Curated annotation (Swiss-Prot):
Keywords: Ribonucleoprotein, Ribosomal protein, RNA-binding, rRNA-binding
GO CC annotations on file: cytoplasm; small ribosomal subunit
Cited Gene3D superfamilies: 1.10.287.1480
InterPro entries: Ribosomal_uS14, Ribosomal_uS14_bac/plastid, Ribosomal_uS14_CS
Biological source species: Caulobacter sp. (strain K31)
Domain of life of the source: Bacteria
Statement: the UniProt record of this protein carries the keyword rRNA-binding: yes
Gene that encodes the chain: rpsN
Ranges annotated as spanning the membrane: none
Family: Belongs to the universal ribosomal protein uS14 family.
NCBIfam families named among the record's database cross-references: PRK08881.1
Function: Binds 16S rRNA, required for the assembly of 30S particles and may also be responsible for determining the conformation of the 16S rRNA at the A site.
Entry protein name: Small ribosomal subunit protein uS14
Amino acid sequence: MAKKSAVNRNLAVKALVKQYASKRVALKAIANDESLPLEERFEARLKLAKLPRSSSAVRIRNRCEVTGRPRAYYRKLKMSRIALRELGSSGQIPGLVKSSW
């Protein structure tokens, strides 16, 4: 199990990203629009830099829904390889069968 504080921190980052998403998209559009004057684009970049660092989507870490483990994460299943193996072995994931040859 991952530390509760790490899992909660990641949840807080997700909330911040959701809160500032529209503002961030609008500022990025202004900053990247080459038809606008340079000063206006620069102001948009400054405003973007003043937003909280954790409001950027790259700060979100994919974590296992079962254990909170941050590594070896399968996106489709939203869980780590270890949780997948345990749940798969106990037959709790439909359609997952242990391979044998």
